[in-house]
Amino acid sequence: ISAQENMPIILSDSENGTEVADNFIDSKDIAKSYVIGGTYSISNSVERSLPNATRIAGSSRSETNAKIIEEFYKDTDIKNIYVTKDGTKNKNDLIDSLAVGVLAAKNSSPIVLAGNKLDTTQKDVLNTKIIDKVTQIGGLGNENVVEDILDIQEETKYTVETIDELNAAIKRADANDIIKFKP
């Protein structure tokens, strides 16, 4: 998202925060900051030192990923989703996410970080999207995630006759479903 929105990525140090980048931040007159990750990764003091900071964090890497998709990909229609390993088994697996980042930015498409299955929060946010294409990046290890995303995209048709049935169908339906109201 940083390349897509022309936002620099500033890395922070657990002891010195963004000290090495403070001159850059001041010189670029940055008006808005996003802190990605919880307080274990980036302290509250670092967050407070940044201009107009908003923290995007979950209880896990997968939940943080879901919140990033929710925050920066508001449209229902998504051209492509790139699925990469989340680095929990091997931190070197995260290189796939970095490698596909430029392509994802060019296509305005999110990256889904996942192990061998989607997190519930990832499923919830992807359930609100209509995804044209799912692309697995890197080697084996997250094929189940690709299948899960494709399953989420299946269309369900509801035919309802009463307002109560309509309300129930609306609660169950996702972005790919069709509800026919025949009173």
Where are these regions (language model features)?
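Extracellular glycan-binding segments that recognize GlcNAc-based cell-wall polysaccharides
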Residues: I1-T156
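Acidic Gly/Asp/Thr-rich repetitive segments characteristic of extracellular carbohydrate-active
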Residues: T156-K182
